[in-house]
Amino acid sequence: MVLVNEMTQSYAETCVQIIQSNNNTITIGSQSAGANGNISKFTLPRGILGAFSGLGWYYPDGWVVNRQGVKIDHEIRPTLEGIRDGRDEMLEAALSLIEEKTEEE
């Protein structure tokens, strides 16, 4: 079970892809940052600094991670009600899925 959200970025997205290579992996959460690859920095006139990712990052089937994020099996987003109640809805969903899988076995 892998939990991801918009804070999952760069090397963490690469780690998620590695874990997902196991067919038993379930990924839940919301879109990751889609921001992995090397950083190429440059300086424009007047000392203005800039940077960009110089690599495309893909799954073997061609899915582009850049700007789209990692693949998600179950999309779960926090709700206003859950936030008000101090609940971790993503963790609750993960535990529920684990319980379902355990009962199936």
Go through each PLM region and give its residues.
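C-terminal "post-core" interaction segments
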Residues: 1-105
